[in-house]
Structure formats: C-alpha cells, structure tokens
C-alpha cells in the first residue's frame, strides 16, 4: 500500500489508525463553549488535556458546498471550482445548480486515498453533497437523507437502516445529523474504515442560538459520539464549514437587504442580476438568505458607480470587484459576478422581496455566508506538532493536520 499520496500540490501520510474527519455544519464556536459551560459536552471539555483545540478560517462565501469541497480537496475554490450552490453561466445565460460533480475541477483526497488502497467511508446528512464528495470514490458513500435507498452496488454498504436502528429522518431535524454519527459508529465498529468523513446539517444552528436547551442537547449528542469514536481508538478531527449568526434587529425582525430591488430602483429593471449562491432546495433553513451575494452588471451600468451605490447602503460590509474577491477569497473568476457584496454580521442579502418565501422562518433568522461567519473550530483528540509551518490555519488544513502533524 502507498504510504504517501499527493493531491492538489499537498502530500498526505496515510494513517495506520482509523481517522475520522467531521464537518459540523454551522458550528459557530460559541455553541461548543456554551455546551461545555452547561456541562453538556464533557468529552470536548477534556480535549484541552490530551487533545488540541485550535481556530481556523473557513472559505468565503461561508456556505456548505464550497467549504466541504475545500476540506476534502485540501484546497480553496479557485482550485476545486465550487464557490456556492449556484452560478450564472454567461454562455447559456442561465443560473446553474452546482451540485453535479461535473463542476468539480480537482480530485478529492478521499478518492486518492481509496486509489492508494485505503478503505474510505463518507456519510453526509443531505444527499446534495454526496455526489460531490463521492466523486470518483471507490468506497462507502451515502447520505442520511436517502439512507433507505442505500445499496451495496452503488453505496458500498447495505441494510444501513437496520444497522443504525433509526428510521430515515426528516431533512428538517436534528435527527438527520444524529443518523450520520450513528452510521459512522456502526461503520467504525464493523468495517473499520482507514478514513471516514462525516458531514452534518445546520438545521439546529439555523433555529437555535448557542446556549439554548435545544442547541446544548444537540452538542451533547455529538459529544457522546465523539467520545465513542475516541474509545474505539480512532483519530478524531472536528471542524466546521462555517459559523452562524443571528441576522435580526433588537426585537428579532430579520435584517434583509433586497439588493435586486435596490439596484432596479437605481438603474432600472434588467440592468443588473443579483445571484445568491446560498440558494438550495432546502430553503426552510434560511429562506435563501445569507450574507454574501454576487452581482452581474449589464454594459450600461458603470462598475465604479455600482460599487459606490452598494457600499453606501447601511448593512453592507464590503463591495469587491471580481478580481478583488478572487484574490482575497481564492475564488474561480468564471463562476462569480462582476461584484461580490458582503453583509455585516447582523445583515443578510436577498434578491427581490417577492422571490423569498419567509413563511418557514418560525424563529428569528439565523444564517451565514459572510466574513463574520469565517472563524471555525479545529479540534483533535491528539496532540499536534509542527504548527509553526502554518501562516494561517484554514478548515481545509484539517486532513493535513490529522494525517501529517500528530505528535
């Protein structure tokens, strides 16, 4: 078996112990802190003694797909190409959903590990990520969302519902993430993969603030699984795809800037196009509202004028040109607009008011997407060495850290 693999200009030492990398969707660090303070996460609390607790930056836009793909490629979106759920194809003049693996421009560490002879397992909460994360992977790969459709031929495992002892959970539930962890434990005990990647959903974080009973119960559940993985002898590495913040005013009303309406009023209809890369089929979570938007300008709209106009709107943190955004956030130039707009911590960006269904938001809006959700945990159940070689820790360094930097 190959002991070293090279993927996207980085080298990875193959582990001799089962290694589990966990992406906790929407894990603002305060969730962990509050759960520990409430006595709900005793295993995580102990990691300061025998593990390593660090903080890193996620990819901006701080959304699920760009960050999960960065983690499994060890590279930013400028390399792997996935910079949101949607992009505007200038050739076809259509908004394109990027859930298909054909939009992935780089190999994954997971697929390369499997090619090197390792048993690799991937369990995601939502099925939208499975095709991307499982691209060219010969191993185990399935989602909790469609666990009842798992087959040995397509997914590398079977009878997962019976093994886990849970029914298929609702997409809009904490149970969807618990299914991921329970399935991971079953795989660890029975198949004992060399490497496992577990990715949850941020349903709880979108609905419940850090320290609330619901949030603490969710983190207590995860903590119990982390402990069981540790007791099974696994190397456990935990990070997040992004943080999470309230996007409301003082009395809980959503702070939304409908950029398409504002731009239409300023320049006229059909002169600009606002695209929200957070948009996905699961809008109940966030109403397709996040703190990042990209804007396409027609020829008649001067770029400098549009920048000044958008930057002058209260709640807008920054407006960047395409080249500025690609340089600062390492994004693919052909998949973002002429401008990138970032909302402040308490503000989300929409397109037009009539394009957003907010009826599913039964609690004050919480979302992500901006720089304000960039800080994420990097937590390990082992001591690490050689960290001086990192100028800046990123969530997509986690596989490198787990495989190459154990003491």
From Swiss-Prot:
Cofactor note: Binds 2 Zn(2+) ions per subunit.
Binding locations of Zn(2+) 2: 202, 206, 368
Residues noted as binding substrate in the record, renumbered to the chain: 64, 202, 242, 368
Cofactor: Zn(2+)
Membrane-spanning intervals of the chain: none
Residues reported to bind Zn(2+) 1: 25, 64, 241-242
Residue ranges that the Swiss-Prot or TrEMBL entry lists as coiled coil: none
Database matches in NCBIfam families: hydr_PhnA
Record's subunit section: Homodimer.
Family: Belongs to the alkaline phosphatase family. PhnA subfamily.
PANTHER family named among the record's database cross-references: BIS(5'-ADENOSYL)-TRIPHOSPHATASE, ECTONUCLEOTIDE PYROPHOSPHATASE/PHOSPHODIESTERASE
Protein name: Phosphonoacetate hydrolase
Species name: Pseudomonas putida
């Amino acid at each position: 078996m190959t002991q070293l693999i090279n993927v996207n200009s980085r080298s990875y030492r193959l582990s001799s112990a089962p290694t589990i990398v966990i992406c906790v969707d929407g894990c603002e660090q305060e969730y962990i802190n509050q759960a520990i303070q409430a006595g709900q996460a005793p295993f995580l609390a102990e990691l300061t003694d025998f593990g390593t607790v660090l903080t890193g930056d996620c990819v901006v836009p701080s959304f699920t797909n760009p960050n999960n793909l960065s983690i499994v490629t060890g590279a930013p979106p400028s390399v792997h190409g996935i910079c949101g759920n949607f992009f505007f194809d200038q050739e076809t003049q259509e908004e394109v959903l990027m859930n298909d693996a054909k939009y992935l421009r780089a190999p994954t560490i997971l697929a390369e590990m499997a090619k090197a002879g390792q048993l690799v397992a991937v369990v995601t909460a939502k099925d939208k990520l499975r095709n991307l994360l499982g691209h060219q992977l010969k191993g185990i790969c399935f989602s909790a969302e469609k666990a009842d459709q798992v087959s040995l031929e397509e997914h590398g495992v079977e009878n997962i519902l019976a093994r886990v002892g849970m029914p298929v959970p609702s997409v809009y539930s904490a149970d969807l993430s618990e299914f991921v962890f329970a399935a991971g434990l079953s795989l660890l005990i029975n198949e004992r993969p060399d490497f496992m990647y577990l990715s949850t959903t941020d349903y709880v974080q979108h609905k419940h603030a850090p320290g609330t009973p619901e949030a603490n119960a969710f983190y207590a559940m995860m903590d119990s699984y982390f402990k069981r993985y540790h007791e099974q002898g696994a190397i456990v590495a935990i990070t997040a795809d992004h943080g999470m913040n309230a996007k409301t005013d003082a009395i809980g009303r959503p702070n939304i800037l409908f950029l398409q309406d504002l731009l239409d009023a300023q320049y006229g209809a059909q002169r600009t196009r606002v695209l929200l890369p957070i948009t996905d089929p699961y809008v109940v979570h966030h109403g397709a509202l996040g703190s990042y938007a990209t804007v396409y300008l027609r020829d008649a709209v001067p770029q400098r004028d549009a920048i000044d106009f958008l930057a002058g709107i209260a709640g807008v943190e920054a407006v960047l040109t395409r080249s500025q955004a690609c340089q600062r956030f390492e994004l693919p130039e052909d998949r973002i607009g002429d401008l990138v707009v970032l909302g402040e911590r308490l503000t989300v960006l929409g397109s037009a008011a009539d394009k957003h269904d907010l009826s599913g938001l039964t609690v004050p809006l919480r979302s992500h997407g901006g720089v304000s959700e960039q800080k994420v945990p990097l937590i390990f159940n082992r001591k690490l060495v050689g960290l001086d070689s990192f100028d800046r820790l990123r969530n997509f360094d986690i596989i490198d850290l787990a495989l190459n930097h154990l003491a």
